[in-house]
């Protein structure tokens, strides 16, 4: 059984200097990244994905950015999330850009690449 994290969003108590969150970014992490901190810590370290996401959400909020973090081991779930936060979302729910670490899907997923292109939002791997 694989775990899929629910989207994690910045909340108001993370905002610094009363800045409003003016941009929205989607951070996507792919296959096996949920094991960070547990899997081969001598190679990948002891920091968990949850720790990394929490740190990034706090840092993004300082710059007025709402960061939505998702992780899945399932290719179709990642495609669904890309579509949801892009073309299928109401304007207010759409993200401004996507940051993706597809992990093993980097070499094999035409579906994720197609979803990113169809989304018509800037993205970076």
For each feature predicted by the language model, list its residue ranges.
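Glycine-rich, phosphate-binding/catalytic loops in enzymes
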Residues: 43-45, 115-118
């Amino acid at each position: 059984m694989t775990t899929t994290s629910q989207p994690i969003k910045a909340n108001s108590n993370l905002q610094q200097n009363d800045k409003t969150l003016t941009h929205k970014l989607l951070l996507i992490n792919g296959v096996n990244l949920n094991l960070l901190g547990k899997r081969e810590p001598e190679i990948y370290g002891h920091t968990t994905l949850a720790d990394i996401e929490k740190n990034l959400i706090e840092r993004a909020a300082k710059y007025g950015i709402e960061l939505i973090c998702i992780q899945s081991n399932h290719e179709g779930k990642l495609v669904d999330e890309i579509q949801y936060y892009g073309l299928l979302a109401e304007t207010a729910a759409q993200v401004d850009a996507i940051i993706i670490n597809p992990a093993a899907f980097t070499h094999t997923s035409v579906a994720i690449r197609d979803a990113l292109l169809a989304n018509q939002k800037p993205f970076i791997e």
